């Protein structure tokens, strides 16, 4: 026996409004209201709504085309940079776990959104000026040059992860704790941060080679 699905002339009303759920990183940290202090880096620190993810593991092919990695969510770039040195290659889940634990520690210590601290740390850690080698074989000199915004973001992420990795080596503190300390110190502009010290050193060398 066939079931009747209403009268022939009857129309079914569709729901007019659909609630859009906010996407929060790890189900906790929202991307709304994040402020990037350095206006030149706003296009290269991917924290806008179209870059919102639940986990920093999009598995997209950002290396296929030049400059496409600027579209990668900034927390995923931080996670990928933790997978350095051969023994850590490919251990993405371990890196995601480290970032999640460090975000929890940062929130406990500061009471702020960890994503805002990451944005501030990257803005403060990217060197604005660097020096490059100019000249042919025999006569080589160093010349100060301005650093592109994407290069600043790349270098800041690398310095932050390197500082956390070196601080945790032969240390009772876990790498999640060291990463949280490094990000907080860099966001505050403290000289206790490895990334801030290296950035100041690079800018000092560039200034002497102007």
UniProtKB/Swiss-Prot annotation:
UniProt keyword annotation of Transferase present: no
Keyword annotations from UniProtKB, A to Z: Ribonucleoprotein, Ribosomal protein
GO cellular component, one term: small ribosomal subunit
SUPFAM superfamilies per the UniProt record, alphabetical: Ribosomal protein S7
GO molecular function: RNA binding; structural constituent of ribosome
PROSITE patterns xref list: RIBOSOMAL_S7
One biological process term in Gene Ontology: translation
Domain of life the protein comes from: Eukaryota
Pfam families recorded: Ribosomal_S7
Isomerase among keywords: no
Similarity comment: family membership: Belongs to the universal ribosomal protein uS7 family.
Protein name, as recorded: Small ribosomal subunit protein uS7
Organism: Podocoryna carnea
């Amino acid at each position: 026996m066939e079931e009747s699905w209403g009268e022939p002339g009857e129309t079914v009303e569709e729901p007019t409004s659909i609630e859009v759920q906010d996407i929060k990183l790890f189900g906790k940290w929202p991307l709304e209201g994040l402020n990037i202090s350095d206006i030149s880096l706003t296009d290269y620190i991917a924290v806008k709504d179209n870059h919102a993810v639940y986990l920093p593991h999009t598995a997209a092919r950002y290396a296929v085309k030049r400059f496409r990695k600027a579209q990668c969510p900034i927390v995923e770039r931080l996670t990928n940079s933790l997978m350095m040195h051969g023994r850590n290659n490919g251990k993405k889940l371990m890196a995601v776990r480290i970032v999640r634990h460090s975000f929890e520690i940062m929130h406990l210590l500061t009471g702020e959104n960890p994503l805002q601290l990451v944005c501030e740390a990257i803005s403060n850690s990217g060197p604005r000026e660097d020096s490059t080698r100019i000249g042919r074989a025999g006569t080589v000199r160093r010349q100060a040059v301005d650093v592109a915004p994407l290069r600043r973001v790349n270098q800041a992420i690398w310095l932050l992860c390197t500082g956390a990795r070196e601080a945790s080596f032969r240390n009772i503190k876990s790498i999640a704790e060291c990463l949280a300390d490094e990000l907080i110190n860099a966001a505050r502009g403290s000289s206790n941060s490895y990334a801030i010290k290296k950035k100041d050193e690079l800018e000092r060398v560039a200034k002497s080679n102007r």
